[in-house]
Amino acid sequence: RIPSSAASDVYKRQPSDMMDGRIGLIRKNLDKHRYQDVQILSYAVKYASSFYGPFRNAVGTKGILKGDKKTYQMDFKNKNEALREVSIDIKEGADMVMVKPGMPYLDIISLIKKQFQIPIIAYQVSGEYSLIMNGIKRNIINEKAIIESLISFKRAGANAIVTYFADRILKYL
């Protein structure tokens, strides 16, 4: 079933759970209900990462949620799985892909860019943000590290970036 918001101002869908076949099912249902213009952002490359820790602490889910996301998120040591999952999701109808977290996987962004003709969204997660902010607060690095980190995504091949620094980078634009 397609939510009514798909017919209004929402033109993208992004299932973040990475379950196999999810993109194909969403595309099939969107097309069936004449929402061919709704784009799908695939979270095909979502690593089981320690960099999610600060977010889980901030929202209070660290000790509450049961189960282990490592059962469906990717092993950070594996690059071939990322390329395989991107290929599958493109065949199922994905219009763009997310790489999450971003900074530790700049090589993966670059490989996807070289192998596929699809927009890539890099997600700079809470742990990446925390590392940079702690460095700035302790005067270990300066605030220009924010821009440097974002430029690295673009240089690797990302078409867009999701970051907790959005409000801070406005002064650099």
Regions found by a protein language model. Name each.
Residues 124-135, 143-173:
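Extended, intrinsically disordered, low-complexity segments
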